[in-house]
């Protein structure tokens, strides 16, 4: 499996890198080759997810793959939503994000499967699992009165805002508004410039 890669068909049991199986285990099915700006290449395979991630990786030395390393990172070992790992050190990286309760939105660059064709690096906004977001378009941005969207409009998907606030090139959409719900508190967000 580690030497073969395939894209899984889209359905409710596939997670992009693996398939859900009875018993709550996601088993890996896809091998990724990661290319870094410095020219390093790593082969990466998530073997399974069950209360944490078990994965394999190997570095390309210019002529062949080095010895395969296997690691397991358990969830819940620190106060963070994400697990971080360094191929350079071969270990989990601690304390790279604020505590779970200390953030709502992360403005960052991330990769998405753009237009169902390819992985594409985007600039956008990811949300904490502590909030839900509703996207309304068209809506007047600069207004002193508004009505919050219906409860069913809110999503916990991490990339609800994502890159949808702007076209691939140019200024943000002038008629897009996001409602962010945290508990019983609502925030209204819209973008006015890009860059």
Can you describe what each PLM-predicted range is?
Residues 1-195:
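Surface-exposed, beta-sheet-biased, low-hydrophobicity segments with strongly acidic/polar composition
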